[in-house]
């Protein structure tokens, strides 16, 4: 099972090595605006799932939202510590 920290480490490694075929690398290459649109899309899907589709589907959408948030963190140079100090 992945944790927030292990996912961030995995995505950071893919970004640093520019791993061929990586969706993360592709998303980072498309830039902040594209990543932001993905975050908004997944946030909306999370809300709809919570309203109408149950806990399992909501958790799935939340995991996708977390993924795109972490890609944005990498894009903007934001660390886990930056997030933790603001919780």
From Swiss-Prot:
It holds the Pfam family PRA-PH. Pathway: Amino-acid biosynthesis; L-histidine biosynthesis; L-histidine from 5-phospho-alpha-D-ribose 1-diphosphate: step 2/9. GO terms for molecular function: ATP binding; phosphoribosyl-ATP diphosphatase activity. One of its GO terms (cellular component) is cytoplasm. Coiled coil: none annotated. It catalyses: 1-(5-phospho-beta-D-ribosyl)-ATP + H2O = 1-(5-phospho-beta-D-ribosyl)-5'-AMP + diphosphate + H(+). Its EC number is 3.6.1.31. It is found in: Cytoplasm. It comes from the Bacteria. The keyword Glycosyltransferase does not apply. Belongs to the PRA-PH family. NCBIfam families: histidine_hisI, PRK00400.1-1. This is Phosphoribosyl-ATP pyrophosphatase. The lineage of its organism: Bacteria, Bacillati, Actinomycetota, Actinomycetes, Bifidobacteriales. The gene is hisE.
